[in-house]
Amino acid sequence: MLKIILISFLFVINLYSSEVYLLPKQSDDAESKISELIQEADSEIFIAMYNFSYKKFANDLIEASKHGVRITVLFDQKKTKKDDEILDLLRENGIKTVVNKDKNKMHLKVVLIDSKTAIIGSTNWTKESFEENYDLIYITDDKKLILKLKEFMSKI
């Protein structure tokens, strides 16, 4: 009986794959993984990012868009007033950008890729966040979590 319980437990644990990156120590690995996931996207990427000024990821998104991936990036209105270089770059390259005009701050750091992968955490997409900050990035294919994130973000 104990064997059955242990096997069942191990199956449930391995049902979803996930990775955690602790920055700044694992910044290079996290950057590489995010770029890889963007490049491997098949159909769609949805991003809600409070602070997005890292050109490396913008260029990855532009390349994915050129290969037919539909991309939407949600920005916070107050933050884009201060720095809109990435917003303009993405728009110029045909990527759909949405600026949250709600009175509430859009402080999310969420990426959904093909409704199969979620990237969440405390990390903004800025060079400083990857080089100087203590931050966390969590990547998962947990279907329940992805569905919950999609539902939540569709209401913003």
Feature-to-residue mapping (PLM):
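Signature of lipid phosphatidyltransferase scaffolds
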Residues: 30, 118-156
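Solvent-exposed loop/turn segments at secondary-structure junctions
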Residues: 51-55, 77-81, 103-106, 117-118, ...
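Primarily the HKD phosphodiesterase
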Residues: 34-92
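Sec-dependent N-terminal signal peptides
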Residues: 4-13
